UniProtKB/Swiss-Prot annotation:
Keywords: Cytoplasm, Differentiation, Metal-binding, Phosphoprotein, Repeat, Spermatogenesis, Zinc, Zinc-finger. Disruption phenotype: Mutant mice grow normally and appear healthy but males are sterile due to massive germ cell apoptotic death after postnatal day 14 with meiocytes ceasing meiotic progression before the early meitoic phase. There is also increased transcription of LINE-1 and IAP retrotransposons accompanied by demethylation of their promoter regions. Belongs to the UPF0224 (FAM112) family. This is Gametocyte-specific factor 1. It comes from Mus musculus (Mouse). The lineage of its organism: Eukaryota, Metazoa, Chordata, Craniata, Vertebrata. It comes from the Eukaryota. Zn(2+) 2 binds at residues 51, 57, 67, 71. Required for spermatogenesis and is involved in the suppression of retrotransposon transcription in male germ cells. GO terms for cellular component: cytoplasm; piP-body.
Amino acid sequence: MEDTYIDSLDPEKLLQCPYDKNHQIRACRFPYHLIKCRKNHPDVANKLATCPFNARHQVPRAEISHHISSCDDKSCIEQDVVNQTRNLGQETLAESTWQCPPCDEDWDKDLWEQTSTPFVWGTASFCGNNSPANNIVMEHKSNLASGMRVPKSLPYVLPWKNNGNAQ
């Protein structure tokens, strides 16, 4: 029994393709081959069913119920189910004692108490308090030469997006 288990794990073992009996595929490539061969042989694929315990098992549809009852891989799944049901009874979830901390913030109140004027792009802003010495308007700085200006809109056709037409 142990020899067959070790033999089934050998990645170099040759397996016969269920779709084309002439195909001998290494075990490590078998799942990929099954997908490819299933597409190439749809007539044979319609006659075969896939084992729910091991997708490598392709069995004639008439024999699938017998295969399910006697599949070697079923024992692994059943053992997992048994272990999960045992652990479910033993496992008790601890109640969380976390509580939300009290909230000291009131954003609406802070908004009404705000004394500074909000920033608005494109309007003059004054620095500091309202003394005449501090009423200096911050001017917009530009890196362009004095005679140039920034375009107000983009051109409809961008020169670098001319769809490959050479100019």
